[in-house]
Amino acid sequence: MRWHGRLHGLTVAIMFVILFTGEELKAQDINSVQRNKLMLPELIQGVLARNPELVAARKQWEAATNRITQARSLDDPILSIQLWNVPQPFKATQADNTIFGLSQNLPFPGKLGLKGEVASRSADMTEQAVHAKERELVTRLKQAYYDLFLMQKTIQIHHEQVELLRQFFEIANTKFRAGKGSQADVLKAQVELSLLQQQLPVLEQRRKTAGAMLNTLLDRDPSLPLGLAQEPSPLPIDQPLDDLHRLALNDRPELKAAELDVQRNEQSHALAQRQYYPDFNVAFQRFQNYQANDGFGAYVAMSIPFAFWTKPKYDAGVQEAAAGVAVARAQQQTLENLTRFQINDLLAKLRATDQVATLYRTTILPQAEQSLESARVGYRAGKGGFLDLIDTQRAWKGFQLEYFKALVDRQHRLAELEQVVGIPLDRQS
């Protein structure tokens, strides 16, 4: 009997250490909750201002814009000096003829304009790539934000479960001391608490990983502490499917870029056809004669692209450009079809997760909470077993986690849908 009492005292001491550790961790978590709130709109502004991927995309746009002037410009003029019949030994001033020339290559009218249009369409495509990168980064930021929320909420639920098991332990210990319960119930509570304590380091690591991803998108130190991510308030998506299709087809940057690619290839095709026309070279010359009168001269030269031995080259260029137009149009149609599919698919997934989250929030969680309270009252009154109480507690915890996972999955799908459609569908954004 004395050994039995010592064993019970040792068990209580161990439980005290575990509970003290749990309470200390819980206090740390409460302190983290009291930090500044992490607001999604402010983070979106930050990622659009600082993310290096976006900085690089904007610089690529700037570079592409500067290619337009280059494409529209003439080649450099050529300054030449010719010496004819220079006496020996070499004396340049006594050459019979010294010719100073200035020449300029002139493409056939319209060629430079078409080259500029091709470069302009390429620059416009790069601009749309910037807008697409902005949407992509906002989507990734939202998903990282809600991943962080899920891990913070998981840790909060973990500490709530520790507190709940502490209460179960106190009930079991009180019943055991009064001779109305079994020491096995006390030991079961100890085991459950130990299992929870083992889970905490893994949860903390996952929270740090989620925070590091968010900081990386914001171009900050991955280990920088973050505030508390806010729980989303899911609102129904009221826009009809046809309206979402119309918005995406009109505003999606990738589709605008595809249309610009068609235009660019059409301009390239027109330029290839213009290669059948000759280019020119004009020159102005000044003649200085050693023992004769000085004078001026000029000439005009013309290329012959329609010679039978060069024309096949230009024929192939036109055929290549025509194939490029066909490819661009096919890719545009493919992207339009993909956009419609993505909207249908994401909207269906979004509504499915909405239904799941609503079912948990309105039915499963209230029922599980009632079941837990009933099991606790029944065990305290001696009408239920401790194992039933533990099973009910596990179910309650699992249902909470599944609810928040469904909620976060819903926000992931919403972010992806907003990326495709091109407008915010969530007021919190």
Question: Predicted segment positions?
Answer:
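Bacterial Sec-pathway N-terminal export signals of envelope proteins
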Residues: 25-84, 105-106, 114, 120, ...
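Residues that define the transmembrane beta-barrel architecture of outer-membrane proteins
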Residues: 94-98, 294-298
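Bacterial N-terminal signal peptides
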Residues: 11-21
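Periplasmic alpha-helical coiled-coil/stalk elements that build and connect Gram-negative outer-membrane
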Residues: 2-3, 9, 132-249, 346-349, ...
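Acidic, low-complexity, intrinsically disordered peripheral segments
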Residues: 2-6, 26-32, 402-429
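A glycine-/polar-enriched beta->alpha junction
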Residues: 45-55, 62-77, 89-92, 100-117, ...
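Amphipathic alpha-helical coiled-coil segments
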Residues: 56-71, 133, 137-157, 166-169, ...
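Short, charged, amphipathic alpha-helical segments
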Residues: 117-120, 183-191, 386-393
